Amino acid sequence: MTYTATIRLYDETELDLLRPDPSKIAIDHIAIALSREGRYANQGRLVYCVAEHSYLVAAGCYSFARDVFDKDQEVFRLLQLRALFHDSGEAYLRDLPGPLKKLPAMAFYREI
């Protein structure tokens, strides 16, 4: 039996989460989705979206990397991008609260 897990994105693009086509993954999909997705299962005292979190991680990484990797611009840029996009998968697969993610029954989710 073949399963699909297709979702429709804001621009009507469809993406199969089990067999994602890289050509259908776009930076605007990521930016829009992460700006609408709250951290901490939306249970924080303040609204704190994943996009803001990603930006703050990248800004902190920039400060650190500037001092450590300033002479190696290639590593510096890659580290900044990695920091900015570290939660980009959440644009397509929502994040689960940590305690739930750790359950053995959720191994399939971690695999995806």
Describe each PLM feature range:
Residues 1-112:
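Metal-dependent phosphohydrolase cores
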